[in-house]
Amino acid sequence: MIVRSLLLAGSLLLASVVPASFTLAKSDGPQIKVKEFDKVPTDVHYFEDTDTIILSGKKAELYISTDAAASWNLLEGKTGILYPNKYHTQSAVIYGPNRKHWVTFDAAKTWREFEVPDKLAFGGGFMPFTFHGKDAEKVLLSAEECQFMTCRHVTYYTTDGFKTVKRLFEGDMGCFWAVGNPAFGEGEPHLPDKLDDRVFCIWPHATPLDLTRRLVYSDTYFSDRKAVAVEAGGRDIKGVNNMASVKKFLLLAASSVGTSEAAIYVSKDAVHWDRADFYGGPKVRGGKFTVLESTNYSIQVNVASRRSRVPIGSLFTSDSTGTSFTMNLDGVNEDKDMITDFEQVSGIQGIFLVNIVENAEEVKKGATREKKLVSRISFDDGRTFKPLKCGDKELHLHSITRPSNIGRTYSSPAPGLVMGIGNTGDKLGTYETGDTFVSNDAGVTWRKALDKAHKYEFGDQGSLLVAVFDEYKDKIFTDEISYSLNHGKDWKKAKLPHRVTALQLTTTPDSTSLQFLLVAEDEKKKFYVMSIDFSDVHERKCEKKDFERWPARLDEKGEPDCLMGHKQFYKRRKADADCFVKEKFKEPLPETEPCQCTKEDFECAAGFLRNKDYECEPHRKVSPPEGKCKNPDDKFMGPSGYRLIPGDDCLKKGGVDLEKEVERTCKDATKAPVSGQISVETTPFKTKNLNYRYLERSDTSSGDDETVILKTDDGDLFVTRDHGKTWQRGKFKEPISLYIPHKYDNDVIYLLTEGKKAYWSIDRAHTFHSFEGKLPITRTLGTLPLYFHPDHPDWLIWIGGQDCKGKKCTDLAYYSKNRGDEWDLLLRGVGKCMFVGKEGELTADDLIFCSQHEHEDPSKSLRLISSDDMFTKKTSIHFDGKPIVGYAKMSEFIVVATKNGTELSSFTSVDGKTFAHAAFPPNYHIDAEYAYTVLDSSTHSIFLHVTDHPAKMHEFGSILKSNSNGTSYVLSLPNANRNDRDYVDFEKIQVVEGVALANIVINPDEVKGKGQEKKFRTLITHNDGSEWALLPPPKKDVDGKSFDCKVKDKGTDDCALHLHGFTERRENRDSMSSGSAVGLIIGVGNVGSSLTPRAESDTYMSRDAGITWHQIKKGRYQWEFGDQGSIVVVVAEEKPTKVLSYSLDEGETWTDFEFSDKEVTVEDISTVPSDTSRNFILWCRPGSSNEIVAYNVDFSGLKEREKQCVLKKESPEADDYYLWSPKHPMQKNNCLFGHVSMYHRKRPEAKCYNGPKLDRLSSEKKNCECTRQDYECDYNYGRQSDGSCALVKGLKPADPMQICKDDPEAIEYFEPTGYRKLPVSTCEGGHQLDHLVARPCPNKKKEFDEKHPGIGGFGLFFAIFFPVAIATGVGYWAFSKWDGKFGRIRLGESQPESIFSRDSPLISVPVTIVAGTVAVITALPLLFSSLWRSFRGYTRLPGSWWGQRQRPYASRGAFAARRGEYVGVVDDEDELLGAEEFEGDEEEDV
């Protein structure tokens, strides 16, 4: 039941005056009793099957009546908000103040007080109480636990009616009962043993570095500290947003990065989950669908249209499984809050009313914003819809989007009685001009009941209709009510004691009572609660002769109709009978008669859909039985496509049976078994330059297409949906200048022309729609023409060029919130503008940052400004308007470069409001003419490359790494190579945490002083840039021969493996690793003392994330990973060939395959960015022609990849997979960043394919004790040659007491040690190198002593004497055994087993090492914001057994982004294919 309160705010106070009583004679009408109130009540709640009512007010006063509103009393000692238990109508809970609450299980006769340790959640998407569907004593409580400025969500539970309240889950995003509805589980044969105890919780952090929310469950209230993740199709369901109980169904909504499409999963047993498919209408988008009132055998969902600027939806109805939805009706009316004009007629199966937008297509196209609303009714469960008829005119009624009363809009449990406010004509008018209409045959026919709009209610099972004039909006008062005793045919009036305007009119929920309650306001703003009692209007109680057997549904002939295998009848009082039923609280129940089975009793079976003729036809090809279909003309007996709807009780005998198998032809069946061959398809294109783009699929994307678009030099656009097997040419009037994929939605792409004209597609390039910008796109070098919003896919910023001279324009920024239909000016004279608001962060949706030229003159310097109202009224000028060089949005940071005289400075913000100055390493100055490039921020730190030497062809610089809030940088790697386009030889290895490769210049002095050519070496880090090492060379080459140099396990200056990096890559989107082929790396290089020219290189591969390497091919090869690494393809680089090589065992063995009958030069090899496909495209050039030939190479036919691999989470190594853990080469255990991570990897010998993307990271993980590898040098400290950290000479550490000044709640601070913990590390205990000696904050000595209690005098004696005695002996022993290297805490190899290792506090503590803790006061808000950020503002605090919170990340670095995981590449937004002018400056180049 939808409850709408239209009452004014205010406190509910009983008036001090004596309540009035107004009584009419028995024959004249109802008896009316009045209570006067000073303030209006805000809610009315009836306890079902009782005369008990509770009223609540704004100040939390509660009043109770036990005689159907005849008298009222204050509910003594209880204030708060009443939450009724909708499944157990005698039960309700009062949400009280000060953590005290009350519960009743006997309709407010008695109350029990209870307390909850934390404040119950209120708002923010959480309800304080979640009731069990079957057990009134089982309740989940949603609470909020806060410390300082950080809060986390906590769920409590009770199973004994609040006698005890226990903690269930910490840091969740909401918990739910499996039995959330009384109907759940009914009729299901196999249900869990403890289904009634099963609880689901949305868990936001499934892994240390994985923020994709899972749904987990427990049958023991998590008492065993075990949570089982919900799966569908053998994969964890990720990105869970919400869960709901709908009759017999559990629904789960999930979303994913890279698409606005949402996935809906359904379960009928709380065990097995299947994704729901939606056919024939718009795709389901996150937050853009509404689950409507449904039945036990079907779910109704309204899906919002993405095309429309005003709210319009499409009505979908599911089959009995809840997993196959078909669109029944398009253009359904809804409001901006997704409230939908849809309501079922109460108590009668298959009848519902809906309002639709008749001019929906015009509205969607933007031709008009005015909706033409018309009403429709369905009598057959949504199969067909008809107009409402009042005589020979069409009738249109206001619905849920325009509520006028509480409760249902049209009907009640009174059988067949339906009322509404509306008008006849061609469309729905305003509510104020509407009249009141009534139907007594469930909507088949209608008559006008009363002039003007009225609030109305049903009583005595429909024998009595009551209405009161409803013009509260215009403050029109009335002193009478209307009532009908004959189903609305005739109406009588009764006087009210005051002239009032009605606020609420209601009665008992079952509509069996003769007593009604009216809440009203008079002209003097006094408020009344009136009890209107019709009990004495009829003296006689109805007898048998006064009732009729009323058929609930009639067919076109007026005969009783069948639905779900039966006819439905009610015992109903005849309209003209002069009696009352007087069976209070006895709701009428339907009688049924069975029908013979007809076509309507069957639904489409799995794999079949209804066509326009309502026949079930195959949605996909039917699989023939084993041994059948040897020839295409063969036939076989297969499924009919129909099945009887579960719960349908029709009689099969003598009826229709559509479930019998039917004969089918083999040519229409699924294709034959795999051929064992690799297939090739070729397509030529007349273009010299290669410009292509994949439209990647995300986790929640539906469909299975593999779409690629290609733009030719002439501006033609080609699209393939089968990965290059077939192509279609786009039909556009103007040549396409460039295409821009949506940065945050992979299904969306924009095509731009040279002028104002542009096109967009939101359905993966299936259809395109045109729009125009206000100005032609900018031609200013380095400026992008389109920017996108991360959460609102239809919001755009358009940068248009004005007064362009060559490649320099006066640029204007416009914004649109409807995909270019309408534009409004943002600013003139801009550099660039971008949305920076993002869900889960402390930023507004409308927050925009712009760099703008002073005085709007493009020859002037840039300044940084921002606004959260589109620059209409509020504009914030940052850095006092001082010049900036540029800014970038990187994952969780906004980084700004400012110009200060001859130096560059960097500032960082995580909330878009407060910027903190980034402290660079001591004595490190960045020349204002130099550049720095933001490389990566995927591990909660910013990697920054700063140019030290900018001479053309001799560029190199330093890689700096920030702390967790981007305010303090330390040197990670000096002399890192870069090129003249500001690309850097730095690449993160995807999936595996903290591993990166970089090339350094080993002769910097010679390059600087003598202009010599750069010489390079390749280094690798396994701990996020804290330590770098040379790559170990392979022991043998591919032919089994030794290299010219040898080492044991580590690379040396004379002998190591060196690989060519990003600056030499021909295709920026290629990468050495893969987001799905975990641990695999391929590169081109050589073994020796330094990197040799690329032409002299060979091809190498690592299978363990860079620990060991193997030569796989002599010479230079291009490579691609397919099927998540189970297929690796390489092909010769820059030389004619017709052969590719592939490996099915991670590079152990290779097979050659001839893909062409003539030699071609392979320009590039590609596959889907996720590397999950078994298809590849070789982009080849025949000879020196100006033609590109696309070769689709399909490995799906291989026998070795015929079946899908099996992964069982409960036994992950039992079948086709094993668990693999990355490691640090200098550690004996597998701890990396404080934890052991285990990844699912397919066994190389397993003959199967991976299929959909795996959840690579296993849930089997553990945190480790802290060691040196979990720390890096703090600010103002530098790494020494032995790996330790020491204070830089001449510098002082920052004041460690700054934390006490910044945080008034702080009790202690720690003396600096020179070390800081890696932001990505989750280690616990062990060696806390950054927290050795604690000191009390000023005036906090007492609290400090309580936290660190001391010892008594006797203990003090032993604390002094005993260590001195022991130290004398131990010191001598240690001196004789130790290597003399006291005095450093090192970040070298870790051997923590010995207490005399360099890790040992016995060695390290006596030596004082002072470190500089960052003391930038303005950084504190950044730190708080960083801690505060999580899904919709909630996060964890330390101490939860579910682990500590980890911040979100998604790498967007200064390299070209094709992989969807953590690798740093150029943002898709910045990669404007087909426009070379834009390649100079990337978004992250500051």
Curated annotation (Swiss-Prot):
CC terms in the record's Gene Ontology section: cytosol; Golgi apparatus; membrane
Keyword Glycoprotein: yes
Protein's cellular compartments: Golgi apparatus, trans-Golgi network membrane; Prevacuolar compartment membrane
Signal sequence bounds: 1-25
Pfam families associated with the record: Sortilin-Vps10, Sortilin_C
Keywords annotated in UniProt: Glycoprotein, Golgi apparatus, Membrane, Protein transport, Receptor, Repeat, Signal, Transmembrane, Transmembrane helix, Transport
Main localization (coarse): Golgi
Transmembrane segments: 1350-1370, 1402-1422
Residues bearing attached sugar chains per UniProt: 296, 900, 965
Keyword match Hydrolase: no
Lumenal side: 26-1349, 1423
BNR repeats: 377-386, 437-447, 483-493, 718-728, 1100-1110
GO BP terms, alphabetized: Golgi to endosome transport; Golgi to vacuole transport; protein targeting to vacuole
UniProt-listed InterPro entries: Sortilin_C, Sortilin_N, VPS10, VPS10-sortilin, WD40/YVTN_repeat-like_dom_sf
Topology term for the membrane: Multi-pass membrane protein
Residues in compartment: Cytoplasmic: 1371-1401
Top-rank lineage group of the source organism: Eukaryota
PANTHER family in UniProt: SORTILIN RELATED, SORTILIN-RELATED RECEPTOR
Family: Belongs to the VPS10-related sortilin family.
Function: Functions as a sorting receptor in the Golgi compartment required for the intracellular sorting and delivery of soluble vacuolar proteins, like carboxypeptidase Y (CPY) and proteinase A. Executes multiple rounds of sorting by cycling between the late Golgi and a prevacuolar endosome-like compartment.
Name of the protein: Vacuolar protein sorting/targeting protein 10
Organism in which the protein naturally occurs: Trichophyton verrucosum (strain HKI 0517)
